[in-house]
């Protein structure tokens, strides 16, 4: 049985830890800092870190890799198109890998960075997606390297996964993302309900993740570029007609950058 835990790091990062109760092995996703992981291992001395999964090269996702590799000899898997410290396995689109007995498929999702990847585990009841900084709860990552067209295509690809897919993204940005989503769609009751719920959770110091794809399709403006209300608001912000969904996305992303 696999349990998934969020290890907080820095101001708003989550390092996801997968714990295999049967084998007493574990894996982590995007350890920007080694300390939370080493602390967990100290508290669970019977567990061995076997794998480190990396979605992209930003330091808040890879900063702890070298120290963890040295301490545990864990296997490091990350995107082939980016420079990843201590990487053992270079991954490209459609690659398959097995971690703690779970098979994951690699999805290339350029936009936030050009080589960004996501890890998807297909399951009949609870599929899993570790989306890094591509798809957030109610939002998406900034475009540091890619184009709006690339990021929109990446999000559209992820949107084709099953609605039951659990979304494990790397940051606690949900509250600010929902406030932006409400500015885009002030009459969307799903957004209003989710915002109230997340406000309550955060006031109780609870995390807002994981999300799920069905909820994202109802409340994430970056997955709703087909919606008339979203396009109209994007047109209003850009003072013109956005003639494609990627143009609507670009308008929304530019607005969010200054929100």
UniProtKB/Swiss-Prot annotation:
GO terms for molecular function: hydroxyacylglutathione hydrolase activity; metal ion binding. CDD domains: hydroxyacylglutathione_hydrolase_MBL-fold. Zn(2+) 2 binds at residues 60-61, 133, 171. The keyword Zinc applies. Residues 224-245 are annotated as: Disordered. It is an enzyme of class 3 (hydrolase). It catalyses: an S-(2-hydroxyacyl)glutathione + H2O = a 2-hydroxy carboxylate + glutathione + H(+). It comes from Pseudomonas savastanoi pv. phaseolicola (strain 1448A / Race 6). Binds 2 Zn(2+) ions per subunit. The keyword Metal-binding applies. One of its GO terms (biological process) is methylglyoxal catabolic process to D-lactate via S-lactoyl-glutathione. InterPro entries: Clx_II_MBL, Glyoxalase_II_hydrolase, HAGH_C, Hydroxyacylglutathione_Hdrlase, Metallo-B-lactamas, RibonucZ/Hydroxyglut_hydro. Pfam families: HAGH_C (PF16123), Lactamase_B (PF00753). Keywords: Hydrolase, Metal-binding, Zinc. Its EC number is 3.1.2.6. This is Hydroxyacylglutathione hydrolase. It comes from the Bacteria. Pathway: Secondary metabolite metabolism; methylglyoxal degradation; (R)-lactate from methylglyoxal: step 2/2. Its cofactor is Zn(2+).
């Amino acid at each position: 049985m696999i349990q998934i835990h969020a290890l907080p790091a820095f101001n708003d990062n989550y390092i996801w830890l997968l714990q295999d109760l049967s084998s007493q092995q574990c894996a982590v996703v995007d350890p920007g800092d080694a300390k939370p992981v080493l602390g967990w291992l100290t508290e669970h001395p019977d567990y061995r870190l076997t794998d480190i999964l990396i979605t992209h090269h930003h330091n808040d996702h890879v900063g702890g890799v070298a120290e963890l590799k040295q301490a545990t000899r864990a296997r490091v898997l990350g995107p082939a198109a980016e420079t990843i410290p201590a990487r053992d396995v270079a991954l490209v689109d459609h690659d398959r890998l097995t971690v703690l007995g779970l098979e994951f498929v690699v999805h290339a999702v350029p936009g936030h960075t050009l080589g960004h990847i996501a890890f998807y585990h297909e399951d009949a009841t609870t599929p899993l997606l570790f989306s890094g900084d591509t798809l957030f709860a109610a939002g998406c990552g900034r475009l540091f390297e890619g184009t709006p067209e690339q990021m929109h295509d990446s999000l559209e690809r992820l949107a084709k996964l099953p609605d039951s897919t659990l979304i494990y993204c790397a940051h606690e940005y949900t509250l600010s993302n929902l406030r932006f989503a409400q500015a885009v769609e002030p009459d969307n009751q799903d957004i209003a309900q989710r915002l109230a719920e997340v406000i309550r959770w955060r006031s109780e110091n609870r995390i807002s993740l994981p999300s799920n794809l069905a909820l994202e399709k109802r409340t994430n403006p970056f997955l709703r570029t087909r919606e008339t209300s979203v396009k109209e608001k994007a047109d209003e912000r850009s003072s013109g007609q956005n003639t494609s969904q990627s143009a609507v996305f670009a308008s929304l992303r530019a607005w969010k950058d200054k929100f």
